[in-house]
Amino acid sequence: MKVKFKQFKNGVRVYNLGDKYIVVYKGDVWGIGSTEDEAMADASRVYRDSKGLMLEPSPFDIYEGGTENEEDVEPLMDYKEVAVYYFPPYYLVYDKEKDKVLGSGMDLDDALAEATREKPGLVELFW
């Protein structure tokens, strides 16, 4: 699937997955949100909490610039209606028809459980 993302000079990427934005820095997901700003704020909070730096700037305190790009992202699992993507450490269950993330989690079972709330019967695809 083609995924749009914004690349910043310091290595931060913000992926646009339809109704979810994911912030990736140095190969790891740092924030998720419904908007780009929400995802960046989440990433900044998580970064500061993990480093114990409440007042220090984080790599995610960027609000301007960035280059818009697109790349192909291969799914971990691909089915007719849904696909599962892995952005370390998060799994995402993505509805291809609705262009929407149905579930996410640090464990595939958690992502599937969240996704089946919106799309009952989905679990049969995976078992």
From Swiss-Prot:
The organism's place on the tree of life at top rank: Viruses
Name the UniProt record assigns to this protein: Uncharacterized protein ORF127
